[in-house]
């Protein structure tokens, strides 16, 4: 379907503060109108939509034009004052044919790439991911108009400060995430990952076990990938432990984050027996630069390319589901 080629999976998070900011919010405008075009209930597997012409003419194009026109008036801005215009869309075609930019006086050069060829429509995260992509190329003083759409829209009038140069290239952002993406080998693997098909026979998987009290006690290691660094000898270990395995000092440590630390494969195996949607199941032990080792499952990898000493990065992924609770952990 068209949705399969246009939709994508992704998330975005921004840190909000009032000191030393890279981007200033100089104004916000919102417009709401009761309009149903696309929907999905909690238990629905697929997104549903009304007839496309009605959705685009009476909904998407009309509501975006009203929202952005009013936003420009509210903050006393002209289209030529804006460096980049960011607006999401439910499909690549809808974004390309959107009538709002021309109606409001924007040029094609001002429109931010919607990432459909690289990531796709990730839903709520889509405009924020487009913003991150714009900030990777932004210069101090640039003005960005960030627009979200749903039964109307919200417009953020943003100004880039000189602090942006300290962030560019130091975060994964869009560029680095896209650079490490792996293509699925075939359409069947996609359907399997989505749970849309099942195998003719699959051995029963082990029943996952999770302890919520333990997950809470070790939340810094599980959620934030924190290890401990001994204050006396400098030994780093994972997960956080009270006793140093090298000098045996007790409670003499500082927590250190390993999530962004360069790492390499120490050893690995290929498990063809354990049930998995992406065989073989690849387990590895990873050594972090400066100390620390973790055993974990590998993701986004080609089993034929694995080798000892291969550089890897850590990613936070869905691990398993138990009693209707989704648990997350780190993979390499």
Regions found by a protein language model. Name each.
Residues 1, 97-130:
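Conserved catalytic cysteine-centered active-site region
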């Amino acid at each position: 379907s068209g949705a399969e080629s246009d939709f994508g999976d992704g998330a975005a998070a921004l840190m909000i503060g009032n000191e030393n900011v890279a981007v200033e919010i100089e104004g916000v405008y919102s417009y709401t109108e009761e309009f149903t075009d696309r929907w999905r209930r909690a238990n629905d597997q697929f997104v549903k939509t009304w007839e496309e012409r009605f959705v685009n003419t009476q909904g998407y194009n009309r509501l975006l034009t009203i929202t952005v026109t009013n936003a420009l008036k509210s903050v006393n801005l002209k289209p030529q004052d804006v460096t980049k215009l960011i607006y999401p869309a439910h499909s690549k075609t809808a974004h390309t044919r959107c009538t709002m930019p021309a109606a409001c006086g924007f040029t094609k050069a001002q429109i931010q790439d919607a990432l459909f060829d690289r990531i796709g429509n990730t839903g709520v995260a889509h405009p924020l991911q487009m913003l991150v992509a714009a900030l990777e190329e932004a210069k101090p003083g640039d003005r960005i108009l960030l627009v979200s759409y749903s039964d109307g829209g919200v417009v953020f009038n943003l100004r880039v400060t000189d602090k942006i140069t300290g962030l560019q290239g130091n975060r994964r952002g869009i560029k680095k995430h896209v650079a490490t993406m792996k293509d699925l080998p075939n359409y069947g693997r996609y359907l399997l990952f989505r749970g849309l098909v099942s195998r003719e026979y699959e051995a029963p998987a082990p029943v996952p076990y999770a302890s919520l009290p333990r997950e809470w006690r070790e939340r810094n290691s599980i959620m934030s990938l924190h290890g401990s660094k001994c204050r006396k000898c400098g030994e780093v270990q994972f997960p956080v432990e009270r006793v140093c395995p090298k000098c045996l000092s007790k409670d003499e440590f500082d927590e250190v984050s390993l999530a962004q630390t360069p790492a390499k494969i120490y050893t690995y195996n290929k498990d063809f027996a354990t049930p998995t949607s992406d065989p073989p199941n690849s387990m590895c032990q990873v050594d972090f630069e400066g100390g620390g080792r973790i055993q974990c499952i590998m993701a986004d990898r080609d089993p034929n390319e694995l080798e000892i000493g291969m550089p890897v990065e850590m990613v936070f992924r869905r691990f398993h589901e138990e009693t209707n609770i989704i648990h997350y952990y780190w993979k390499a």
